[in-house]
């Protein structure tokens, strides 16, 4: 039985939440393997919008959901989200949610440092959400992190927090010139959360591998997008974790040979939140139209998303980096009514045309997109249930995406709800 990884191919906000919610109906387990609560997944069920930031989207389908070792977790946010989902009538018992004992915890000092650092950068800021994700990953890399396993030993937890906060407070006071934090208060706060958290803590790697050996189907849910990847994204305007499909194995504790398919989610146009290069960004009425019709506001920050034409240089890059075996096209209906639709097929920079992503951020910032133009369609496609019922120009647009990317389209989404989805090939079946 197949195990499927779902990743974003752009800069996040591609509609992964809806697709994971849809595919979760066929999976037994759903796993989040990287990132933190700097990402938000939005699901619309029976007209009701539900947003999750840490708990995998599969919780809506009453599946067993795992938060892997590659995720950094703010325990306060996690418990707030569990309470929110519970208030919506969703089963959030420890039988449904498992947190890796090896996942790192976002501590109060991580958030203080994150916000102070961004403030100090001024105009050079990169647009972090200020939720402590980056500083937590820093501590993980330098072997100073606090993991969920540390909550099992109260004395050890207190000792580790006291030691690390001596350094963090020195940093806050002497470099950022901002308020310090009381170690005793932090320890007391987390010990107050301990009893609620302990039932959820699990060896996720063991549980997942055991389930796979028993034939359980697993869906791995990525956060953000390929071009926010710490290794392959538009560095330094990236997130602090690896967002590509290969990290599904490392970030959850399974072998890469157990990943069967990789589905790349691509919005029918391109958006980005925060700072960073964006070659196809539109500053005209079409960009405004995409933003308004697509309701392009971040689920986590509420920030207005920048909008532009579909960028095939990005998509081909994502296909290569992730080894995509299928594409999911989302928000296709947002393009309804446009007379002309453009696709970026390359970048031009000082007389040179790039058909691959340039590594130098300065080059990317100075690139001019090379476009090909396609006729749009006037019809409303949001109610269409069968691919063959699409207008001819819609089908030609989709065919061109498939041709340029070299990846087959498996699913097309024409609205926020589950029902507004056309499945061409269900890999779980």
From Swiss-Prot:
GO terms for molecular function: adenylosuccinate synthase activity; GTP binding; magnesium ion binding. GTP binds at residues 12-18, 40-42, 305, 331-333, 413-415. Plays an important role in the de novo pathway of purine nucleotide biosynthesis. Catalyzes the first committed step in the biosynthesis of AMP from IMP. Substrate binds at residues 299-305. SUPFAM superfamilies: P-loop containing nucleoside triphosphate hydrolases. This is Adenylosuccinate synthetase. It catalyses: IMP + L-aspartate + GTP = N(6)-(1,2-dicarboxyethyl)-AMP + GDP + phosphate + 2 H(+). GO terms for biological process: 'de novo' AMP biosynthetic process; IMP metabolic process. It comes from Desulforapulum autotrophicum (strain ATCC 43914 / DSM 3382 / VKM B-1955 / HRM2) (Desulfobacterium autotrophicum).
């Amino acid at each position: 039985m197949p195990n499927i990884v779902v990743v974003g191919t752009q800069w996040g906000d591609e509609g992964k939440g809806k697709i994971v919610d849809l595919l979760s109906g066929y999976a037994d387990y759903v796993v989040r393997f990287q990132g933190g609560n700097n990402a938000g997944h939005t699901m619309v069920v029976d007209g009701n919008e539900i947003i999750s930031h840490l708990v995998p989207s599969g919780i809506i389908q009453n599946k067993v959901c795992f938060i892997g070792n590659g995720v950094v977790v703010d325990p306060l946010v996690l418990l707030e989200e569990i309470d929110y989902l519970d208030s919506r009538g969703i089963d959030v018992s420890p039988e449904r949610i498992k947190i890796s004992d090896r996942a790192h915890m976002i501590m109060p000092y991580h958030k203080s440092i994150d916000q102070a650092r961004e403030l100090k950068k001024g105009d050079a800021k990169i647009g972090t959400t200020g939720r402590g994700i980056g500083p937590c990953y820093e501590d993980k890399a330098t072997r100073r992190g606090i993991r969920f396993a540390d909550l099992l030993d109260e004395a050890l937890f207190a000792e580790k927090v006291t030691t690390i906060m001596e350094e963090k407070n020195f940093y806050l006071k002497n470099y950022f010139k901002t308020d310090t934090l009381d170690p005793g208060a932090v320890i007391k706060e987390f010990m107050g959360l301990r009893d609620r958290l302990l039932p959820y803590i699990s060896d996720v790697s063991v549980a997942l591998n055991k389930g796979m050996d028993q034939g359980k189907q697993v869906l791995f849910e990525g956060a953000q997008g390929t071009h926010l990847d710490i290794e392959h994204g538009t560095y330094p305007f990236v997130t602090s974790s690896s967002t590509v499909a290969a990290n599904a194995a490392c970030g959850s504790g399974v072998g890469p040979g157990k990943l069967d398919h990789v589905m790349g989610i691509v919005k029918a146009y391109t958006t980005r939140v925060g700072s960073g290069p964006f070659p196809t960004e539109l500053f005209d009425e079409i960009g405004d139209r995409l933003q308004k019709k697509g309701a392009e506001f971040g689920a986590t920050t509420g920030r207005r998303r920048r909008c532009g034409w579909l960028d095939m240089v990005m998509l081909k890059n994502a296909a290569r980096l992730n080894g995509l075996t299928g594409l999911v096209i989302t928000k296709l209906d947002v393009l309804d009514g446009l007379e002309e639709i453009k696709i970026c097929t390359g970048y031009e920079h000082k007389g040179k045309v790039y058909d691959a992503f340039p590594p130098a951020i300065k080059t990317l910032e100075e690139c001019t997109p090379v476009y090909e133009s396609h006729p749009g369609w006037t019809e409303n496609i949001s109610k269409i249930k069968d691919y063959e019922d699409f207008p001819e120009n819609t089908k030609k647009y989709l065919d061109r995406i498939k041709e340029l990317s070299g990846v087959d389209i498996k699913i097309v989404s024409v609205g926020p709800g589950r029902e507004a989805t056309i499945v061409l090939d269900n890999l779980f079946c």
